[in-house]
């Protein structure tokens, strides 16, 4: 590769890095770094199946969606307190700000956490506090999207919708995540109708 080509590529990268950006689809649980996962595991007395963060980082080479989801849900187990959700959200928003993201819209799926005994208040209050601090300190605009899991039941999705009602005015939209097969969004028509009836916008849904 010629010197001029290398310089051109570097100039383009520098230009791209400096541009203001919007990140409109990111799942907070999937942003959990190996170092933070281990820190939260220690804080909450949770054993992980890896010896250290370096061994965990080696697993971040995914063969398919399911291999990603397996690690994704393993990470969910270390998020227990409002402080945990605050730290996760604040770390992500700091990284986004460093990358010149000026607007970030973040999904979080309460069902995994509620199923393991985490109060919905801990999740929502931790995430929203971090969003407010990031806006005040860094000037980044952040929106929260609540996601339900397609591998769970529609009834559970409707319960989740009810559980986040106290924060409805701070939720930018409702979406859906998880393994697409064999879980088509058509199983959740009543859920989507209910979300629309309550005034929520519907965000991007994996098809």
Across the structure, where does each feature detected by a protein language model lie?
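Conserved small/polar residues in nucleotide/adenosyl-binding loops
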Residues: 206-207
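Metal-cofactor-binding active-site regions of metalloenzymes
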Residues: 2-200
């Amino acid at each position: 590769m010629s010197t001029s080509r290398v310089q051109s590529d570097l100039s383009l990268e520098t230009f791209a890095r400096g541009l203001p950006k919007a990140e409109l689809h990111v799942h907070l649980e999937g942003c959990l770094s190996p170092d933070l996962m281990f820190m939260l595991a220690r804080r909450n007395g949770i054993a992980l199946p890896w010896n250290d963060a370096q061994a965990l980082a080696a697993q971040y080479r995914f063969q398919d969606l399911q291999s990603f989801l397996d690690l994704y849900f393993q990470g969910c187990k270390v998020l227990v307190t409002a402080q945990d959700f605050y730290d996760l959200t604040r770390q992500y928003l700091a990284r986004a700000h460093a990358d010149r993201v000026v607007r970030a819209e973040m999904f979080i799926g309460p069902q995994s956490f509620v199923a393991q005994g985490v109060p919905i208040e801990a999740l929502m209050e931790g995430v929203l506090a971090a969003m407010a601090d990031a806006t005040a300190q860094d000037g980044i605009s952040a929106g929260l999207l609540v996601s339900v899991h397609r591998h769970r039941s529609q009834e559970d999705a409707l319960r989740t919708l009810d559980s986040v009602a106290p924060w409805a005015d701070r939720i930018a939209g409702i979406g859906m995540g998880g393994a697409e097969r064999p879980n088509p969004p058509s199983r959740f028509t009543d859920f989507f109708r209910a979300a629309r009836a309550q005034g929520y916008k519907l965000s991007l849904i994996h098809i």
